[in-house]
């Protein structure tokens, strides 16, 4: 059991904050009494115990009022510390420390808990561990061996909460639930109930899922069977396709070879036709070209080429000169651009220089204006009007410098005067301050000495106070030492360690027997569980057999009518497959016919599309040709338009020739008419009658001569256009022939073919519709039979599985034969629990005996330690008594020194006050002097700075003016203006030269145009001769193609080609049908495999088996949970009733031995089950109340009892709860237990407490703490042999709580 040994308190409530104020209390066993007046700090000790154990603050405080008030201590920070030394449930020594700090802020106090420390002593070594508050709380509850609720409400119950057993119902229920730990067990039951409900729901879900998994498993088996069948059919189909492909390859190769040869023949035929057309066109072109030419050159080709090349050289020479002129013109243009660029740059530079000149004049005006302004400000004569010469400006600068120096000198003199006055004033201030500082140091020094002397005096008085009771304490120590030695001897004599050890050995043997029995029960449980699995499997198999019988019946009833209508009877799988095979063969034949018709229809549709496309292409081609012809001709009458254009070209050629010779003729006529000897017309030889008539003819000829070159140029241009149009129309001659062929032959033939193909398509569609109708009748029968085949296959598989299940049922039945199953799992489990309970009881007894052995050994060790501590304390007190006389003399001496220091400090403070007044006056005078100095200095500096700024601006303008003159900007400006005029003159000369070159180029172009007419005639001759050569080559090539074509056997190739196409079509038709079947099989296999890969069919059998196992296991788990729930519920009820019975028994005994009234026989706690809980809610709740009984009548005490009865009842209930629940912790604290009790009940309470102590005196760990102000009550307790010392709580001269240990005998002396 755990027990507390020592506790120290510092800085808590009224306990002091200095180290010397730390109070230490050692707790006695079995009784510790704390006595003191109200407000002395008794309850604080209980609050400290509760805080150190649970971390909870007293009611009504959050911690800041729990710590010593900083305002009272006159400190900013106050630290509080509580240390407790105790032994845990294992007897190990533990020390716990909790610290707090309270900081005084401006308006409120701030509280903070510091990190706690736990120190354990193991093997003679101390191990410390810093922990957070929550961790310390858990560690304390674990070490003390009781719950936090018991610590708060039973062991260390605060005085304000001491009457909680008679509080209102809800609060009372909460307290009792926490003490009984009922909340945890109720939550455990609720969790079990919820888990059981969840598991039951899961079983239903598993059953539903199992139903679907079974269907998926059966469907997956059916799909696998179908895949196997289709894969066999696919293999056969692939072999047929392969044979067709082997036949087809050599025929395709031969057909390709023949088609290549036919293509070659077709190409030769097309080339011959093209050459014929080309030859005809070339002959026609040559004839037209000869007609267009005025005459044909009769010389050799060499002569024609020489003449043409010489003419070209002449033209090229003239063109070269034209290029040279153009190059010269480009050069002049480039030179003009450069001059224009230079002109622009010079204009920009001229503008920039003009701007600088304007700015220069502006700077001169600004400088003169600033000089006039500053001269006026400084009252300088001779500077009233500008502009100013250089000599005037130098004189101005000299005068300004003199004025600046004078102003600066005046300002410096004024500052020096002020500095002397300030130094004098500071000297006076320093003298006063030195005197004041000296007095301050004296006061501070004397105060420090005073403080030290006061502390020394306080410590000496404290030591004397501690030594006051030392003489009595030595006598007490002698008595305590004799008693301790007597108790040690008695404990060693009464020790029964050996007997307890023998009892432990006996209990260990009994425990070993129980362990063996439990192992046997475990083996029996395992065997029963194994047979339970066998029975479960038997049930599953029987259920599976019934399911399969039902499935077979359903399949037969579902398809019986349908199969009978198709076959005339209900077939088995093989019979149905044979019928399906014959029906499938019929369907395939129909499909083959349908595929052949579809292929023919597709071929006809393709042929129709081809004819439509060809017809559309021919019509578009015709439309395009007609549009092109119309764009060139302007009408559709191509031949007449071409003849008319040729006539116009001929006329234009003649006109061109006439105009070409007109210039020479008109010139000759004019020469003849102007000749004085010639006065008649050169053409008609008519004589002119008058000179005016002659001049009129000359003028007309001259006019025509001037217009002739332009008319020639216009005529040549028109002629070129017409020739170009003629060439274009000649190029369209083949297109015109194509238009005629398209209209008269090709398009009508294609339209006839299209009508024939449409008739074939309609016939094929009728045949296809007939076959599809037949197929639509057969296929539903096949599909219906296939659906039935699936279920028939499943039915046969069910029949096979049914045989297997019947075999397994027989095997499981054989396993269960000869097995005795009278004992169930529940019976064995019940017996196992009983044995386990006995084993736990024996283990607890062993542990208790070991604990008693350990307690007796520790008690003897503790008594030895107590004896040694008393001897050591006696020696220490004897030593301290020898210093008493010395301390009294020291007290008198220190008191005298303190009084003297008080007087000296007071005198010094009286001298400081007049010095402070004088110092303040001198400082104010100095401040005024500094302000005047700063003001005067600012005025002088502002004036000087203004002059400097204006002089600086004048210098800036002067610098800019000098830089302009030194850089020669004015001369540079004039130079740039001269350069600009020169560039403008050069630009004008360049433009004149360009005009002359343009005129020369115009004359050259006219001459070259005249030469081009002769060049065209020579070119036409060369073209004609070249075309004649090409015509000969075309004739030769045509003859060669005819010869090559005659060597090929065209008719035999076409016949063979037709036969090959027919053979290939037949094979392809069969091949396509085979491929269609193959593709159908592949698609069905892929479909089945894809379906098998779907989540519901993948691993369907494994999922079904696993789900069956999970469902059965969950059902067994749910049964176990139900058993455990009921067992736990019964255990909770049994524990609750047993504890309540035990508590009420103790309460009755204590009440009867304590209460002296006759109105109440005894009291007890009633716990009633909650009657308002619904039937569906199986959670158990208890409502608690305290009742008082008189005879057979029970009344609620709450609201009916007196204040004294209420206190006594609460106290007795706490004592009963402590005795019941504090098995590992024998501590209980009673704070003012005599409140509201009369003398008779106080005496009976003291008697009852003594009896409790007596009954628990064998437990060395039992500790009762009693806090009271009633010294009579203490004296009553002191009459027992268990109380020799008690603690008196009082306040010292500093109003801090102190704990003083006193003897009970002295209390009795004082009382009486």
UniProtKB/Swiss-Prot annotation:
Changing residue 635 to G: Abolished phosphorylation by ATM, leading to impaired ability to mediate DNA repair. GO terms for biological process: chromosome organization involved in meiotic cell cycle; DNA damage response; DNA double-strand break processing; DNA recombination; DNA repair; DNA strand resection involved in replication fork processing; double-strand break repair; double-strand break repair via homologous recombination. ATP binds at residues 13, 38-39, 41-44, 67, 69, 159. Phosphorylation at Ser-635 by ATM in response to DNA damage is required for double-strand break (DSB) repair. PROSITE patterns: ZN_HOOK. Its main location: nucleus. Disulfide bonds: none annotated. Residues 228-359, 401-598, 635-673, 706-734, 789-1079 form a coiled coil. Its EC number is 3.6.-.-. Mg(2+) binds at residues 43, 159. The keyword Ribonucleoprotein does not apply. It is found in: Nucleus; Chromosome, Telomere; Chromosome. One of its GO terms (cellular component) is nucleoplasm. The modification N6-acetyllysine is found at residue 959. The modification Phosphothreonine is found at residue 690. Changing residue 1231 to A: Abolishes ability to degrade ATP. The modification Phosphoserine is found at residue 635. It is linked to Nijmegen breakage syndrome-like disorder: A disorder similar to Nijmegen breakage syndrome and characterized by chromosomal instability, radiation sensitivity, microcephaly, growth retardation, short stature and bird-like face. Immunodeficiency is absent. Component of the MRN complex, which plays a central role in double-strand break (DSB) repair, DNA recombination, maintenance of telomere integrity and meiosis. The MRN complex is involved in the repair of DNA double-strand breaks (DSBs) via homologous recombination (HR), an error-free mechanism which primarily occurs during S and G2 phases. The complex (1) mediates the end resection of damaged DNA, which generates proper single-stranded DNA, a key initial steps in HR, and is (2) required for the recruitment of other repair factors and efficient activation of ATM and ATR upon DNA damage. Belongs to the SMC family. RAD50 subfamily. The zinc-hook, which separates the large intramolecular coiled coil regions, contains 2 Cys residues that coordinate one molecule of zinc with the help of the 2 Cys residues of the zinc-hook of another RAD50 molecule, thereby forming a V-shaped homodimer. The two heads of the homodimer, which constitute the ATP-binding domain, interact with the MRE11 homodimer. This is DNA repair protein RAD50. It comes from Homo sapiens (Human). The lineage of its organism: Eukaryota, Metazoa, Chordata, Craniata, Vertebrata.
